UniProtKB/Swiss-Prot annotation:
It is a multi-pass membrane protein. One of its GO terms (biological process) is photosynthetic electron transport in photosystem II. This is Photosystem II CP47 reaction center protein. The gene is psbB. Binds multiple chlorophylls. PSII binds additional chlorophylls, carotenoids and specific lipids.
């Protein structure tokens, strides 16, 4: 037909039956990818250590999304929380993956059917006998159905009225589990970290969608508005649909990167801001000081810190530490975490407790500096030993571990002290297994980083797509010389000027 590759979609422009067919095929591809990806991830996922080797450390991408919607069990007999299960049924990881693949197959067959039987009576205008779609009516139908689905999700699935609920956790990602959520109708519902807002917003948005859908089904648009917004042109639908998608992509990129109730850290890993603000470090110190006030020893207080909380306070779990083009999971970077060595406490020969200054997010290397509780530099690992005044050897720094595997162990050997001081720059110290996966020691990002990068990038591309197609549909007559009221079926590519039989192209 002589179409360039970037204009091939014009073949379905005036063909409602085949336009439907290609969209059904697209749904088949999306659903098939989701199911296949889920099965692949389940094949490589190791559920044995949900604390030190959770799904986000292993680079799982679709498993966290299934889990946040209430799926926790596998046909393999394991549960995401670390327990064992028997007969999880269809509401399981494999069950949902399988239903997506079956649905994909059905959509594939439906797409073929609609491609073959494209000339259906439903697409024909009774008055003219030509193919046409009542786009405002279709908009009303879709808005109504989307509203029903949205309302149903918020009122039944999230609330547990008919469904499992959603993943809910505490602010430090320690006690997460799937549970029913009551809608939050007050001001707290607008807090992005309050799960109740998910239920209330879906109920409210769904109700609005249902009412808006009924409005558009019962009220016809004014003629001037219909013509002004080109409501009879399918490219108007494309443009506004792209707008909806890019807006949603920008929103979820934000909720993922900055964190929200919809992106729990147990499923997607911590955010970079939790490292930047010392979020987990403050909570750990608060718990230790509470333990000391209850007359626990320093060793006992640190031993009560959950390993899960200590692991969050490690820079290797910061999604901003991985480069955008470093492929692979976090486990492929710094290795699989095996155990917490404990919290190192450094002291100089005068008995002052020293604190290692932590590495900021965007540094690859950082000077090792130890300060006292007033922030005064007391020791360092100097770049030039000849000019040093605060070296570990000169200041007589020692280190003692509290909690973890090295609880009660102390070192005064300068080389060992410096080793642990360097590692303290990166947060709590963990033993990491690099051999199993041949990990290269270079930090990787978590699924939180990948999701944000992907959605922000595609949102930007789709923004330009919205502008492009919006301009094309609003100024179609200017760009192509086509009368905006032209309703004849034309074959694109046959004529140099669309619809003008006097400009037939010559066969080469």
């Amino acid at each position: 037909m002589g179409l360039p590759w970037y204009r091939v979609h014009t073949v379905v422009l005036n063909d409602p039956g085949r336009l439907l067919a290609v969209h059904i095929m697209h749904t088949a591809l999306v659903s098939g990818w989701a199911g296949s990806m889920a099965l692949y991830e389940l094949a490589v996922f190791d559920p044995s250590d949900p604390v030190l080797d959770p799904m986000w450390r292993q680079g799982m991408f679709v498993i966290p999304f299934m889990t946040r919607l209430g799926i926790t069990d596998s046909w393999g007999g394991w549960s995401i929380s670390g327990g064992t299960v028997t007969n999880p049924g269809i509401w399981s990881y494999e069950g949902v993956a399988g239903t997506h693949i079956v649905f994909s197959g059905l959509c594939f067959l439906a797409a073929i059917w609609h491609w073959v039987y494209w000339d259906l009576a439903i697409f024909s205008d009774d008055r003219t006998g030509k193919p046409s779609l009542d786009l405002p009516k279709i908009f009303g139908i879709h808005l109504f159905l989307a509203g029903v689905a949205c309302f149903g999700f918020g009122a039944f699935h999230v609330t547990g009225l008919y469904g499992p609920g959603i993943w809910v956790s505490d602010p430090y990602g320690l006690t997460g589990k799937v549970q029913a959520v009551n809608p939050a109708w007050g001001a707290e519902g607008f807090d992005p970290f309050v799960p109740g807002g998910i239920a209330s917003h879906h109920i409210a948005a769904g109700t609005l969608g249902i009412l808006a859908g009924l409005f558009h089904l019962s009220v016809r648009p004014p003629q001037r508005l219909y013509k002004g917004l080109r409501m009879g042109n399918i490219e108007t639908v494309l443009s506004s649909s792209i707008a909806a998608v890019f807006f949603a992509a920008f929103v979820v990129a934000g909720t993922m990167w900055y964190g929200s109730a919809t992106t729990p850290i147990e499923l997607f890993g911590p955010t970079r801001y939790q490292w930047d603000q010392g979020y987990f470090q403050q909570e750990i110190y608060r718990r230790v000081s509470n333990g000391l006030s209850e007359n626990l020893s320093l060793s006992e207080a640190w031993s009560k810190i959950p390993e899960k909380l200590a692991f969050y306070d490690y820079i290797g779990n910061n999604p901003a530490k991985g480069g955008l083009f470093r492929a692979g999971s976090m486990d492929n970077g710094d290795g699989i975490a095996v155990g917490w060595l404990g919290h190192p406490v450094f002291r100089d020969k005068e008995g002052r407790e020293l604190f290692v200054r932590r590495m900021p997010t965007f540094f690859e290397t950082f000077p090792v500096v130890l300060v006292d509780e007033e922030g005064i530099v007391r020791a360092d690992v100097p770049f030039r030993r000849a000019e040093s005044k605060y070296s570990v050897e000169q200041v007589g720094v020692t280190v003692e571990f509290y909690g973890g595997e090295l609880n009660g162990v102390s070192y005064s050997d300068p080389a060992t002290v410096k080793k642990y001081a360097r590692r303290s720059q990166l947060g709590e110290i963990f033993e990491l297994d690099r051999a199993t996966l041949k990990s290269d020691g270079v930090f990787r990002s978590s699924p939180r980083g990948w999701f944000t990068f992907g959605h922000a990038t595609f949102a930007l591309l789709f923004f330009f797509g919205h502008i492009w197609h919006g301009a094309r549909t609003l100024f179609r007559d200017v760009f192509a010389g086509i009368d905006p009221d032209l309703d004849a079926q034309v074959e694109f590519g046959t004529f140099q000027k669309v619809g003008d039989p006097t400009t037939r192209k010559q066969a080469v």
